[in-house]
Swiss-Prot record:
Keywords: Autoinducer synthesis, Iron, Lyase, Metal-binding, Quorum sensing. Binds 1 Fe cation per subunit. Homodimer. Its cofactor is Fe cation. This is S-ribosylhomocysteine lyase. It is an enzyme of class 4 (lyase). It comes from Campylobacter concisus (strain 13826). Gene3D superfamilies: S-ribosylhomocysteinase (LuxS). The lineage of its organism: Bacteria, Pseudomonadati, Campylobacterota, Epsilonproteobacteria, Campylobacterales. It catalyses: S-(5-deoxy-D-ribos-5-yl)-L-homocysteine = (S)-4,5-dihydroxypentane-2,3-dione + L-homocysteine.
Amino acid sequence: MPLLDSFCVDHVKMKAPGVRLAKSMKTPKGDDISVFDLRFCKPNEEILPEKGTHTLEHLFAGFMRNHLNGNGVEIIDISPMGCRTGFYMSVIGTPSEEAVKKAWLASMKDILEVKDQDKIPELNKFQCGTYKMHSLDEAHAIASKILAQGLVIINNDEIKLDVDAMGLKKH
């Protein structure tokens, strides 16, 4: 099995919260695709709470589109990482990390403006697979923490992991 890109970065050195361009590629038709690592938590030190992450997923996706889509950029998907330290965002186009950072911060402010659980998009049994697993309070706490700490741009060269030199397994 090939070693995935996400396992070729040193999670010990990774700063958080921060934005990282995880991958860029071209489709066979020549379209640019960018994948961003939106790291909310320092890996192996903290994780996002389950219910707050789920609520954030419902809110963050729409707000990021409001702030980032346009001028050749369109968000394909924003999904939480299995390790619960952040989200991956796939985008058509090549927005700068600074533009992503600005949109992320604006989205966190928008999340704090949502005052009622009933205002969470698609929060019903027809559109959400676990519609009872939400917490607006936890989502607010996550957003507040990001705004208080600010965001860094994560440099890929600084966190590149040499799996051969470290003797790590490549499955």
